[in-house]
Structure formats: structure tokens, C-alpha cells
């Protein structure tokens, strides 16, 4: 139950709901059969005959690129440090927590599938579950001038496109 995080559990039966999984199910429709991005990854893997080895290699390469970008400071201007206070003290979050420092192809190859029993998508080669935030301010030119805001872009046009939710990994 939602209140468990604040009040703890009481005696008796309780039902735990995975809010992330429930969110996917709600967003895609209760009867869609799609309840997680990992399931759609398995669909894409089957459709395009992508091997487990290719998935692991792509994941490894992505981790190495992210690690190199972090180490070289390329993300530093894009991340605003946030102080997180807890009973144990304060922690400054200023680095993407998703890339794993000790990722190897060997370790990736030992992970078991997590979305389908006979699948190939693992916790190591699936899209990560990351905490994060982003925002942008879109306004009129006259408002930006009035408020002395730096104009960094001009919205000329936009399009909306989508793919079959069962294959969301195909999104371009």
C-alpha cells in the first residue's frame, strides 16, 4: 500500500503494487498485453533477429561511451547538482547514476533474462530505469525580451509521430 512508506505495515494481509509496472500497464491500456519496456524490447529482438551477444555488445559499448563522457566532463554543464538530505547526512547528486563502473562483456553475458523466461533481454542490456529531470522554457519572443531572457532556439515547426506500442524500440 502507498501509505506503507510512511506508516509501515500493519498486521494482516497486504497487497504490494509495483508502481512502475502499474504505470506502464495503465499508460498502454489494461488489456494491451504490454506492461513494460522490456517486453517491447523482446518483441523488437524477435522481429529483427537480434542476438543476445549483439545486445550485450551494444549495451557494453553504450556504457563505455557514457563512462568516457562522464570522466571527460562532457555532461558537467548539463547536470545541476542536487543535495539529497537523509538521516545519514547529505549527498550531492551530480553524476548520472546509470552507467556501471565495472561493466564487462563477461558480466553482461552471465545475466539471466528478466522479461521472458526464454528471452534475451536482461537487466544489463535493457534500457535503464533512471531518475532524472529535464525542463525547457518555451515562450514568445516578446515575452523573452520583456523578461530579458536569453533566446537559445527558435521553434519553427514540429511533428508528432508514433509507432506500435508493442515495438516502441523502433521509435525514430
Placement of each model-derived feature along the sequence:
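A short, mixed-charge helix-start or loop-turn motif at secondary-structure junctions
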Residues: 22-24, 48, 158-162
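Active-site pocket-lining segment
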Residues: 39-42, 78, 86, 156-172
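N-terminal extracellular/periplasmic Venus flytrap/periplasmic-binding protein-like
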Residues: 17, 53-146, 151, 156
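Conserved thiamine diphosphate
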Residues: 35-59
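Catalytic-loop motifs flanking and including active-site residues across diverse enzymes
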Residues: 33-37, 130-133, 172
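Flexible glycine-/small-residue-enriched beta->alpha junction loops
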Residues: 1-44
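Short acidic, glycine/serine/threonine-rich loops at helix termini
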Residues: 1-5, 94, 166-168
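Flexible glycine/proline-enriched surface loops and loop-helix/loop-strand junctions
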Residues: 24-25, 46, 118-123
Amino acid at each position: 500500500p502507498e501509505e506503507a512508506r510512511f506508516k509501515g505495515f500493519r498486521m494482516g494481509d497486504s497487497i504490494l503494487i509495483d508502481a512502475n509496472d502499474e504505470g506502464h500497464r495503465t499508460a498502454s491500456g489494461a488489456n494491451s498485453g504490454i506492461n513494460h519496456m522490456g517486453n517491447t524490447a523482446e518483441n523488437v529482438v524477435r522481429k529483427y533477429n537480434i542476438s543476445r551477444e549483439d545486445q550485450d555488445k551494444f549495451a557494453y559499448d553504450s556504457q563505455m561511451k557514457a563512462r568516457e563522457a562522464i570522466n571527460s566532463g562532457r555532461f558537467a554543464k548539463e547536470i545541476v547538482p542536487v543535495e539529497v538530505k537523509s538521516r545519514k547526512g547529505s549527498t550531492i547528486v551530480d553524476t548520472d547514476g546509470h552507467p556501471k563502473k565495472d561493466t564487462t562483456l563477461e558480466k553482461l553475458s552471465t545475466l539471466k533474462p528478466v522479461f521472458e523466461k526464454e528471452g534475451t533481454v536482461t537487466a544489463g542490456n535493457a534500457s535503464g530505469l533512471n531518475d532524472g529531470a529535464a525542463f525547457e522554457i518555451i515562450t514568445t519572443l516578446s515575452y523573452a525580451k520583456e523578461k530579458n531572457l536569453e533566446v537559445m532556439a527558435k521553434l519553427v515547426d514540429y511533428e508528432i509521430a508514433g509507432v506500435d506500442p508493442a515495438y516502441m524500440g523502433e521509435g525514430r
